[in-house]
């Protein structure tokens, strides 16, 4: 398996970096492309990531034509023929987000069978909210041997209150409701930008989704949907990762195409820490002097709170800021695994249930470390840039799921990073 080697200690990032389309947006968009029975769906600004290839294969396995033009970052989907109702286990088992095909398949075919999904090992991440919502819409759910089978002649509009604003459940139920008989209201819905992006695509397809980005979603069912063109929203987590990278390396970086509104919680905490963050016509500029930064307390929350997908990267920033910072993780359990690896680099930290205390400001040392999940892999690479000596990061399969040419982009900004093949 590939490794990334970082020569750290004096890294100072300067220049411009271009942000890709959002991984967390394009995966449900591909699931939504199952719904139209007329016309083709063209997705633009698609990131070239292993998760995208996996989702393409999930959709192809349903007898849907999927053509990925990597040079143009476009995917053309044609689901106008009869589609299968069993999602391919070979690919579903690789990725958590693949569960979002359950709602679209069920809505279109009246029957769906999907295996329990795989992906990052971050907590239990139960899918009960998905299933409860579908049951409220009239689906009969069976779980046997790791498979989920859902049946409904036609889903019925329903009032659904979600116990937690789950992004995946909101996406699944929103897509299922587009072809339901009647009106569905989802309360305590997720409000992430990726939810808004999905709603925009569905509405272009002929759906009637109202209230995306608020706590209450209203979906008025339609009889059929059609293909359309849609450009994937920019990746706020990739943007945030490079903003943090600039902050922890005394950098001056323009993060091109980054959307200010989508990154507001992160920007607020960076400014509280003392980082200079400004909005420019082409993106967001980050300028930092680490010696002047202050420790902060951060609590992850569903959007519009601080994103859990930026938690690991922000703890890397906390590690270089003198004093004690606190990170409280409220969204997922078991998401501090990267701190164990960072301790190998000299970080002093304590973890008590959902809270990590980071004692920052001590010079870190390069070490051999292993990625534990997608965002942890980015955090370890960022930490390697500020640690003295050589850091080797393994298990890059996690990194490739969510970042395109990550080490190349950092190299162009001034980091000394290489990727090598083999064990």
Curated annotation (Swiss-Prot):
GO molecular function: UDP-N-acetylglucosamine 1-carboxyvinyltransferase activity
2-(S-cysteinyl)pyruvic acid O-phosphothioketal modified-residue sites: 120
Pathway: Cell wall biogenesis; peptidoglycan biosynthesis
Gene Ontology cellular component list: cytoplasm
Entry keywords, A to Z: Cell cycle, Cell division, Cell shape, Cell wall biogenesis/degradation, Cytoplasm, Peptidoglycan synthesis, Pyruvate, Transferase
Record's keyword annotation contains Transferase: yes
Biological process annotations from GO: cell division; cell wall organization; peptidoglycan biosynthetic process; regulation of cell shape; UDP-N-acetylgalactosamine biosynthetic process
Catalytic EC class: transferase
InterPro entries attached to this UniProt entry: Enolpyruvate_Tfrase_dom (IPR001986), Enolpyruvate_Tfrase_sf (IPR036968), MurA_subfamily (IPR050068), RNA3'P_cycl/enolpyr_Trfase_a/b (IPR013792), UDP_GlcNAc_COvinyl_MurA (IPR005750)
Catalytic reaction list: phosphoenolpyruvate + UDP-N-acetyl-alpha-D-glucosamine = UDP-N-acetyl-3-O-(1-carboxyvinyl)-alpha-D-glucosamine + phosphate
Residues at the active site: 120
Highest taxon of source: Bacteria
Annotated residues for binding of UDP-N-acetyl-alpha-D-glucosamine: 96, 125-129, 309, 331
Compartment(s) of residence: Cytoplasm
Family: Belongs to the EPSP synthase family. MurA subfamily.
Function: Cell wall formation. Adds enolpyruvyl to UDP-N-acetylglucosamine.
Name of the protein described by the UniProt record: UDP-N-acetylglucosamine 1-carboxyvinyltransferase 1
Protein species of origin: Streptococcus mutans serotype c (strain ATCC 700610 / UA159)
């Amino acid at each position: 398996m590939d490794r990334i080697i970082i020569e750290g200690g004096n890294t100072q990032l300067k220049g411009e970096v271009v942000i890709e389309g959002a991984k967390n947006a394009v995966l449900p968009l591909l699931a939504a492309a199952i719904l139209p029975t007329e016309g083709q769906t063209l997705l633009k600004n698609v990131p070239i990531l292993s998760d995208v290839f996996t989702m393409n294969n999930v959709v192809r396995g349903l007898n849907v034509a999927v053509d990925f033009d990597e040079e143009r970052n476009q995917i053309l989907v044609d689901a106008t023929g009869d589609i299968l109702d069993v999602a391919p286990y070979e690919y579903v088992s690789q990725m958590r987000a693949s569960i979002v095909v359950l709602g679209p398949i069920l809505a279109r075919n009246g029957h769906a069978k999907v295996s329990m999904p795989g992906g990052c090992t971050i907590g239990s991440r139960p899918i009960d909210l998905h299933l409860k919502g579908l049951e409220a819409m009239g689906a009969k759910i069976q779980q046997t041997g790791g498979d989920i089978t859902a049946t409904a002649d036609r889903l019925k509009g329903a009032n659904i209150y979600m116990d937690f604003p789950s992004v995946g459940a909101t996406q699944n139920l929103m897509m299922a409701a587009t072809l339901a008989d009647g009106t569905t209201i989802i309360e305590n819905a997720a409000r992430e930008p990726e939810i808004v992006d999905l709603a925009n695509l569905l509405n272009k397809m002929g759906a009637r989704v109202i209230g995306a980005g608020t706590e209450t979603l209203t979906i008025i069912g339609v009889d059929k949907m059609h293909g359309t063109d849609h450009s994937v929203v920019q990746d706020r987590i990739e943007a945030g990762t490079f903003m943090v990278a600039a902050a922890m390396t005394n950098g001056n970086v323009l993060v091109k195409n980054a959307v200010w509104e989508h990154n507001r919680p992160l920007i607020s905490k960076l400014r509280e820490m003392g980082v200079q963050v400004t909005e420019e016509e082409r993106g967001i500029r980050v300028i930092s002097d680490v010696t002047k930064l202050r420790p902060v307390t951060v609590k992850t929350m569903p959007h519009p709170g601080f994103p859990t997908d930026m938690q690991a990267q922000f703890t890397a920033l906390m590690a270089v800021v003198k004093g004690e910072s606190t990170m409280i993780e409220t969204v997922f359990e078991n998401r501090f695994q990267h701190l164990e690896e960072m301790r190998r680099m000299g970080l002093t930290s304590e973890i008590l249930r959902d809270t990590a205390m980071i004692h920052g400001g001590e010079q870190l040392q390069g070490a051999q470390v292993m990625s534990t999940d997608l965002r942890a892999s980015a955090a370890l690479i960022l930490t390697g840039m500020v640690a003295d000596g050589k850091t080797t990061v393994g298990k890059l399969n996690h990194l490739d799921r969510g970042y395109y040419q990550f080490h190349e982009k950092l190299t162009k900004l001034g980091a000394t990073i290489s990727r090598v093949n083999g064990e």
